[in-house]
Amino acid sequence: MKFEHRPVLLEPTVDALLQADFGGRGASRARPRDEAAALTRQATGIFVDGTFGRGGHSRELLGRLGPQARLVVFDKDPEAIAVAQALAAEDARVTVVHGGFATMTEELAARGIERIDGVMLDLGVSSPQIDDADRGFSFMREGPLDMRMDTSRGPTVADWLAQASVEEMREVIADYGEERFAFQVAKAIAARRATRPLHTTLELAECVASAVRTREKGQHPATRTFQALRIYINRELEELARALASAIELLVPGGRLAVISFHSLEDRMVKQCIAAAARPAAAHPRLPLRESELPQPILQTLGKVVADDAEVAGNARSRSAILRAAERTSQPLPATGAEDFVPAVPGAAEKGRRR
C-alpha cells in the first residue's frame, strides 16, 4: 500500500543549510554573511540527511546542489532504505546508509569522509510509518504492538511490556511521555497482562485510556504513552545526543546544522545543545588577552522557524514542528570534543536499560 508523505518545513530546512543570509527568530545578529563560501558549499559540498524517510528533504536539497556535491542519507527503516536506494540509482551524488544517525561519524569515516558542509535531521515519525497499521505507531489503527524504526532488529514494544516491572514502565512513561498518570497506566498494563498479553495497538490504547482520568483537549489519552514507548524502544534521545555531538564535530567552519523536532523533549535537547555551543568558553580572568584573542563560540545560532498558517492548513502534522538551525564557527573544539555541549538524556536512560 502506498502512503502519502508531506515533508514538514521543506524549504526553510534546505534554506537553513544553503542560504548565506538565513536567519529565523532568535538568530545571532552579528553573524557575517559569506556568500562566496555558501556558493562553494552548494556546488561541491558534502551533506548528510540523517533521517531520509521518503526523501522529501533530500530531493529538495539535491535540486539545489551542484553536480559535484554529495549527499549521504541515513535511515533505520528498511522501507525508507528501499526508496533511498531507488533515488541513488537515479542520482550518483547519493550514498545510502542503512542505519541511524547516531552512527554518523563511523559510517562517514568508513566512506572516507571526515568533514561535512551540512546536516539535517527530521526527528518526526513519517506519515507512512504512522499510517501503516502494521508498524504499530498509531493508537487509532489496529496493528501489532511493534513501534521499531528498524523492523529487522531489537525487541518490540509488546516484547518489552510483557516483562517490564511496574516501576520500569512508570519511569519510561513519565520520563519520555511526561504523562502525569504514568503510575496508573503502568499498573493498568500490569493488571491486563496478568490475564492476557497485550498484542495490538488498540488493546494498549484501550488499556491506557482506562487509566488516564482526565483528557487533554484535542489529545487522545494514549498519546503520551505511545510517544514514551516509541522513544524508549528506539533509544531516540540517546541517539539524538550522539548525533548532535557528531554533527558539531564533523561540520566545517561555515557548515550548517538544521534539526526539526516535534515534541518538547527533543526540542529542549536541541535548543540546549545549540545554546551551550553558542556560548564562548570562559577566559581566565587574569590572563591578558586582546579582543581578537578572546574565546569564541563553537556555533552561531540561526534561530528557529515554525510552520506558517498555510502549511498547517495543508499538513496538520506540521503544527508542532520546530526547526532550529546553527552554523559552525572556526573556533577549535575543546579537547573533550562536543559531548559537553549536549544535555544529559533525561530519566530512564540515565538509570540504564535493565531489560
From Swiss-Prot:
Which one GO biological process term can you cite for this protein?
Answer: rRNA base methylation
Q: Where in the cell is it found?
A: Cytoplasm
Is-annotated flag, keyword Methyltransferase? yes
Give the matching InterPro entries.
RsmH (IPR002903), SAM-dep_MeTrfase_MraW_recog (IPR023397), SAM-dependent_MTases_sf (IPR029063)
Arranged from A to Z, the UniProt key words for this protein are: Cytoplasm, Methyltransferase, rRNA processing, S-adenosyl-L-methionine, Transferase
List positions binding S-adenosyl-L-methionine.
55-57, 75, 122, 129
The terms describing its cellular component in GO are: cytoplasm
By its UniProt entry, which Pfam families does this protein fall under?
Methyltransf_5
Gene Ontology MF terms: rRNA (cytosine-N4-)-methyltransferase activity
Which segments does the entry list as coiled coil?
none
- EC number(s): the record gives 2.1.1.199
Task: From the UniProt record, list the reaction(s) this protein catalyses.
Answer: cytidine(1402) in 16S rRNA + S-adenosyl-L-methionine = N(4)-methylcytidine(1402) in 16S rRNA + S-adenosyl-L-homocysteine + H(+)
The domain of life is: Bacteria
Q: Where is this region: Disordered?
A: 327-355
Which HAMAP family does its entry note?
16SrRNA_methyltr_H
User: What does this protein's UniProt record list under function?
Assistant: Specifically methylates the N4 position of cytidine in position 1402 (C1402) of 16S rRNA.
Report the sequence similarity comment from the record. Belongs to the methyltransferase superfamily. RsmH family.
**What is the protein name stated in its UniProt record?**
Ribosomal RNA small subunit methyltransferase H
UniProt organism field: Bordetella avium (strain 197N)
Its taxonomic path starts at: Bacteria, Pseudomonadati, Pseudomonadota, Betaproteobacteria, Burkholderiales
Supply the gene name.
rsmH
